[in-house]
Amino acid sequence: MTEVKVAVTIAPEQELSQSTIDDLIQFQDSIDIIELRIDQWTNLNEIAIEKVVEDLQSLKLNKKLLVTYRTSNQGGLGDFGEDDYIQILRKIANCQNIDMLDIEFDQTRSLNILQELIELAHKNQVQVVLSHHNFKETPKLEALKHLFYKMQQLESDYIKVAVMPHGKQDVLNLLNAMSDTADVVSQHVVGIAMSKIGLISRTAQGVFGGSISYGCLDTPKAPGQIHVSTLKKQLSMYE
């Protein structure tokens, strides 16, 4: 069984609120990774990013920091076009005190550009979570396996696939594809079936070879997220 890290997703408005700071401190024992979502920011630039990163560093929580700009095409609030999206990823990869960067995998995006971004991040000792999100449906099992296969051809550190299930078979297909992929690739694998019906994919992530489970501090930032303290307890049942 794979060791699973708990990532807490926070989505502050330009700066950290006191309630977010208090919650991060209170529940720090349940957290391994802080995922900072920035796609909701109206004034997005590297100075604003670095300011929040510095504020997180000042808390001295000793957690890895993952920065994510989620585009609207993959369920986020980000409205950047292709060129602006690539540019902001380059800026994030060059920021100080960032440990991990989320890069979206899209079948229409140039693999050369994706590989260039991954190499830039690695040059700066930043790990890459190559992610793909489908908020509409869950592809068939073979399509899921092929998606994982295409993603693992790039040299990221993690490959993450999140889908929307409409029945128990969708959840089983996601877990099956994640498990089979985890058995044969060198990268860490993450598979999430969103919404309440897919909760087992978050709480039993490690049983099926997954390595990160995402939780929240207050309002879920994705369908099916649960509080990190509950998530940590659920994950510990499989240890």
UniProtKB/Swiss-Prot annotation:
GO MF, any single term: 3-dehydroquinate dehydratase activity
Entry keywords, A to Z: Amino-acid biosynthesis, Aromatic amino acid biosynthesis, Lyase, Schiff base
Domain of life of the native organism: Bacteria
Pathway given in the UniProt record: Metabolic intermediate biosynthesis; chorismate biosynthesis; chorismate from D-erythrose 4-phosphate and phosphoenolpyruvate: step 3/7
GO biological process, one term: amino acid biosynthetic process
Its biological purpose: Involved in the third step of the chorismate pathway, which leads to the biosynthesis of aromatic amino acids. Catalyzes the cis-dehydration of 3-dehydroquinate (DHQ) and introduces the first double bond of the aromatic ring to yield 3-dehydroshikimate.
Description of how the protein assembles with itself and partners: Homodimer.
The protein's name: 3-dehydroquinate dehydratase
Organism of provenance: Staphylococcus saprophyticus subsp. saprophyticus (strain ATCC 15305 / DSM 20229 / NCIMB 8711 / NCTC 7292 / S-41)
Lineage: Bacteria, Bacillati, Bacillota, Bacilli, Bacillales
